[in-house]
Amino acid sequence: MQRRLAYASLLLLTSQLVAPALLAQATGGATPAPAQTSTTATSPDGQATPQSQTPTGQDGQSADEPVEISAPGVDATAGNEIVVVGRNIPNTIRATPQIVSVLSAADIARTGEGDIAGALTRVTGLSVVGGGFVYVRGLGDRYSSSLLNGSPLPSPEPLRRSVPLDIFPTTIVGSALVQKTYSVNYPGEFGGGVINLTTKAIPAKNFISGGFTVAADDTTTSELGYTYAGGDADWLGFDDGTRGVPQFVRDVQAGKGSGLVPAAQVGQLSNASTTLLQRNNHLPANLSGELSAGSVFDIGSDRLGVISSLSLSNTFRTRSAIQQDSVSPDGTLRNDYRTLLTDNRIVANALVGLGYEFGDNTVRWTNVYIHDTLKQGRGSAAEVYNNASGLRFQQNTNWFERQLIESQLVGEFKLTDALKFDARGAFANSKRNAPYERQFDYLCSARTSNGLPISYDGANGAGGFQCNGAYQVTQRFTPFASIIFSELNENLWTGQADLSYKIDGERPITLSTGYFYQGTDRYSSRIQFNYQTSDGAGTAPGFPYNLYRPDYLLSPDVINNACPLRGQGACTLQLQFSTQAGAYAYDAKLNVHAGYVQAEAEVAAGLRAVAGLRYETAIETVTPVQSATTRLKNNYFLPAGTLTWNFAADMQLRASGAKTISRPQFRELAPQQFRDPDSDRLFFGNPNLRDSELWNLEARYEWFYARDQRFTLAGFYKRIKNPIEQVGFYTGADDRLQTGFTYLPSATLYGAEVELQKYVPLAGLGGDFFATRRLVAIANYTYTKSQINADASCVPNPAAAQGSPGLAGCASGFGPARLLFRDGASLTGQSDHLVNLQLGVEDTAALSQITLLFNYASNRVTNRGPSNLSGTGFQPDIIEVPGIRLDLVARQGFELAGGKFELKAEARNLTRTRYNERQDFGNGRFVYLNRYNQGRVFSLGISTTF
């Protein structure tokens, strides 16, 4: 069995929160543009000082060339209106009092990443977990907000509130920003940071570009994996009707019928194409392609731009995993599985944007389409499991289809020199369809179910477990087969208007106000059917049919005559609707209305202040089928303020304070079961959750000691009331580990981060090769410490069944925090140490780069440890060990036949870092919930622009 590919390139998205009329569209941030040009800045004596001339960068972007940014209140001219002492402070930093990081298109290109999440892993204090979800300073994805051109994005993931950023290719993103301090013109849900992606709108000139990349993973490509046929359009990520949902599933979904599906309807299901798991000893390479074009038209003094982009990627990842668990206080294994999973991921993207500039005004209409499909084959075997009776084999075939569509209209208007108005409205729809999640359970036995011996003539030529007999379905495992249909559909309407007015004077003041609306509607369902014979009680087909492989097991002959030894038609196969714990469907709504006022001014020489107040009211409801509605209605006043002291040339001190909130996600509130294909674990919501409230403090020192070079040092502190945490639990001794949700009385998080960026010219080494080249060194380190408070306060007990009595005098479904959690433990998802290093050589006169990228994240908690089945005490927390990651990226440009070409070579995860999620029971005893090797990934790509 082969191991998992490390091709899940980490992507860290950065987003910016800025007050109206404060942020210039200029470069800066985590990895500044590699070039420099002539500018003018204010010197300490108040005189305009010309900057030295340096070559234009290899990406064709100068240090002061505007970066395209669209977000609430962003002003393209603000950087020219603000007086800051120091010639080296980037315009982005001059223009905003907030702490921001900005990735321009050139910055993103240096990382070599294909999606925005991977590029942002290089930003100070950011890490990516679980396939594209951003953690800022160790706070989970629930504390990060994702915006597209300033408008919120819905998530196509039922287990998450935020959008996985690895579905955004870098080809459609003009810039990415992260703001770590809060400003009131953004939504009140803020914990670690806000991420804003700006799509490309008006090209600088007409162009056509395209590219193609091939990649190989040394644990997946041309190695063993599991696949299944599916439909003819699977390679594009779309179902061709093979997985069409029969009407009887819709009837059950609508609450019709008895829940028993007769044989005639069972036969309507797609069979062999969705059930037959096959070995593929030579999995193909990973392929991706992209095509984009843009045109710009001059209409008098106005400009009209059109831009479009299409891309498609098809990748494979195989994981050979150890999956264990224990329900014992001492860590004695209950289950010890060896699992092989192969993920075939197909991502299709499209963008069409129109932009119109007239005078100082801009209108843009942006349409984004992202379709992300995961086709998964899974086989799992064990001899150690609860009440073991021989070698057990489970097989799964899955299809998870996610889709995101957003259409957005933005207007940015400069009504007068002093008055500016921004308006933006958007509609977004996200879907997740997972039809035909199939599972079959077989037991190896030396005798048939009716007592006949089975002869065994030796190994079958395969490695791993050997069945000394034959696999058969029996009533030993109930159900012997199951099928699940799940759907999610979410609509999101948003609108925002921002008005700012600048009062001129010796010390100008900018006053701003705005209104925000968000309306979200979600419907989610999960319908599970278990196969059984018409005898009921989960019975399996009789001999010899129970020896059949899955597609034969569900053939018409077996469906209509499941007990052949008893005579024709004596029993048939039927489906039993399985009402798992919780609801099979729910509706959810979130309506938010908010308004804010804000003032920004230079209150003294070199001292700049911004202060504001946001009022936000929201009603969040989750209504499960046949269950009571959970309703959260809260109103908040959220103050925020930041001081910036430009006390010396090229040096600044910033201090910020704010109150913010975090609401429970729909999935966290809904008592519905879902399986996460990444962690291969079941999740279950909790209707007893409530909002979290955060108090945020931050101070930061910034020294821009040379052009595009800097040293920064920051400290931060957060106090969280009712932080929501993921908790592992077991519903019984035979049940698999599940993840639930609860909140704690409180938690604190504090830490510091340091960043250094340095360029060293190499011309002194002599020769033409080094004449225009320089060394690039970018390093950052973040230390974070958090502690949860687990006292006697009553908190939701995720392991408690609905309506069950509370623990130690607490209400039903609740228990004392000290009985469920370890006081002083770290928050889930938080690493104490994050290290990023980029070391490279680049040409300042042409496109030529080679960069070594190093990333390290220390251990972090993924789930609080489950409570012991006895009800007393709890197991150790579940810990992920991310370790180190080493990547190498090389880019070389050249011209051929009138076109510009770029050749890019990448080597990812050179250390072959293993994924490791475990519990430590002491004395060297570990339980590995998920452990597998991640392969090295080598890719070669070429792109061209005409």
Q: Which stretches of residues belong to each language-model region?
A:
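N-terminal plug
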Residues: P66-A76, E81-G130, Y135-G138, L148, ...
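Outer membrane beta-barrel strand-and-loop segments of large Gram-negative receptors
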Residues: R476, L488, Q496, G542-P544, ...
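Membrane-embedded beta-barrel scaffold of Gram-negative outer-membrane proteins
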Residues: K420-A426, K431-Y442, L511-S512, Y523-R526, ...
